[in-house]
């Protein structure tokens, strides 16, 4: 789409956040090229949705003037990590054409257990999971991330909604 709207798909935050707009242009040509690059699944092009907070909240810090075209490709929540890893490998060919690919979202992101009174402090399991994930990514060791269910309690708590029981 030529002019994606800013989507505020969240709740429970200060009103100022809902007023943020990120008027970056879209690029139907890059969207079509992305669609044609992906062979492992069918990719639909949407003319309605726009850029949700998983996209604009990151890109607005990299390009505050909203002067680069942005397209958003959402994850398929019905598919597992291996599927998305393979999808990302397909997308990597776009980098050779000068297209920046950003995977956004927090590695440890569970607002259901956030302690709003102590926002500067993390849970031990969250710190452990975050540190381990960063180290694996830095080392290029993606197999444990794909097989996150085998990585111990810290990953279990994160990936399964921060269960508070053993």
Regions found by a protein language model. Give the residues of each.
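Internal, conserved structured core segments that host functional sites
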Residues: 31-85
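Short, well-ordered beta-to-alpha junction loops that form the rim of enzyme active sites
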Residues: 49, 104-107
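Active-site regions of metal-assisted phosphoester/phosphodiester hydrolases
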Residues: 70, 76, 84-102
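Short, basic/glycine-rich phosphate-binding loops at helix/coil junctions
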Residues: 9-16, 63-72, 146
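Surface-exposed, charge/polar-rich loops and edge strands
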Residues: 68, 79, 93-99, 107-166
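A short aromatic-anchored loop/beta-hairpin motif
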Residues: 1-45
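Flexible, glycine/proline-enriched loop segments at strand-loop-helix junctions
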Residues: 17-25, 74-81, 158
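Short, hydrophobic/aromatic alpha-helical segments in well-folded domains
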Residues: 33, 87-91, 107
């Amino acid at each position: 789409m030529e002019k994606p709207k800013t989507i505020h798909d969240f709740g429970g935050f200060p009103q100022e956040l809902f007023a943020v707009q990120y008027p970056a242009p879209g690029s139907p040509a890059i969207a079509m090229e992305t669609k044609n690059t992906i062979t492992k699944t069918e990719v639909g092009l949407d003319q309605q949705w726009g850029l949700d907070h998983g996209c604009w909240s990151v890109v607005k810090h990299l390009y505050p003037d909203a002067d680069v075209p942005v397209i958003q490709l959402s994850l398929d929540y019905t598919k597992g990590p291996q599927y998305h890893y393979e999808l990302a490998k397909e997308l990597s060919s776009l980098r050779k054409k000068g297209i920046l690919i950003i995977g956004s979202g927090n590695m440890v992101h569970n607002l259901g257990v956030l302690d709003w009174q102590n926002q500067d402090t993390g849970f031990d399991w969250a710190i452990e999971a975050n540190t381990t994930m960063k180290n694996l990514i830095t080392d290029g060791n993606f197999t444990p991330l794909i097989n996150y269910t085998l990585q111990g309690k810290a990953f279990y708590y994160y990936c399964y909604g921060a269960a508070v029981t053993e």
